[in-house]
């Protein structure tokens, strides 16, 4: 439990606080409290274990816990398939989904996406890169401008990059990028999404909502960030599935 709590606490020292590490810490705290009060809980179970209401309640709680575990396993499997089961081999357009910019430089997560896009482009230099992301309230430049700057500094020719700088969500990333490609008269045979592996499944689900069938170019997430972002993505996928929103 202590190790689990540390795993979710570590990103907070880098000012990364989201539903993923908050839920993870909450589960660790719940487990710690159960361990602390295991003796009185056991005594309570002995005293009330044969009563009908207790049996119904305890079995319901255990059933919900089991359902949660199965759901987490299923979502993780789906996320892995979304990232690696649909990996592209020959996409002629790659859309790099934006992420936080620190000042004018990419955040850790955005740099990972850009490095994945660059690695793919070096093997497929005819591929057109679409960098998609608007300017957040705490960002000095748009995510698209930041990505364009990073990729051109690494040697990608400017004419192989299109900038979409209006979007504020994954859905807008895809919708505005599609409009930009149409404006440019580009009719790609295959479109791949460049984003972190945990985000590929939900991004492809949103793309399907927009009428696209896409493949993936997964960016690897640093190990110390995996628990926080994968747990957050479980919630994101459930939210999208149940409510149809991001």
Protein language model annotation of sequence segments:
Residues 10-13, 40, 70-77, 81, ...:
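Structural signature of transmembrane alpha-helix termini at the membrane-water interface
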Residues 25, 183, 245-246:
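Low-complexity, intrinsically disordered/propeptide-like segments
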Residues 53-78:
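Internal/C-terminal transmembrane anchor helices
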Residues 226-246:
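A transmembrane-helix-recognition feature enriched in membrane-embedded lipid enzymes
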Residues 1-46:
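Membrane-embedded alpha-helical segments of integral membrane proteins
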Residues 74-232:
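A structural signal for short, hydrophobic/glycine-enriched beta-strand patches
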Residues 43-56:
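Membrane-interfacial, low-structure loops and terminal tails that flank and connect transmembrane helices
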């Amino acid at each position: 439990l202590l190790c689990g709590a540390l795993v979710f606490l570590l990103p907070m020292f880098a000012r990364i606080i989201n539903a993923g590490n908050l839920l993870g810490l909450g589960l660790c705290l719940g487990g710690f409290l159960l361990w602390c009060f295991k003796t009185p809980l056991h005594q309570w179970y002995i005293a009330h274990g044969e009563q009908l209401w207790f049996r119904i309640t305890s079995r319901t709680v255990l059933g919900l816990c089991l359902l949660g575990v199965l759901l987490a396993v299923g979502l993780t499997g789906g996320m892995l398939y979304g990232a690696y089961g649909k990996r592209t081999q020959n996409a002629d357009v790659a859309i790099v989904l934006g992420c936080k910019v620190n000042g004018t430089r990419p955040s850790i997560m955005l740099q990972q996406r850009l490095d994945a896009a660059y690695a793919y482009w070096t093997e497929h230099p005819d591929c057109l890169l679409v960098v998609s992301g608007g300017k957040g309230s705490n960002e000095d430049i748009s995510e698209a401008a930041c990505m364009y700057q990073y990729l051109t500094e690494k040697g990608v020719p400017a004419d192989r990059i299109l900038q979409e700088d209006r979007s504020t969500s994954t859905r807008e990333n895809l919708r505005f990028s599609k409009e930009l490609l149409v404006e440019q008269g580009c009719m790609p045979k295959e479109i791949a999404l460049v984003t972190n592996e945990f985000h590929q499944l939900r991004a492809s689900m949103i793309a399907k909502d927009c009428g696209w069938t896409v493949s993936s170019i997964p960016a690897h997430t640093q190990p110390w960030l995996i628990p926080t972002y994968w747990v957050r993505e479980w919630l994101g996928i459930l939210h999208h599935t149940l409510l149809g929103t991001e």
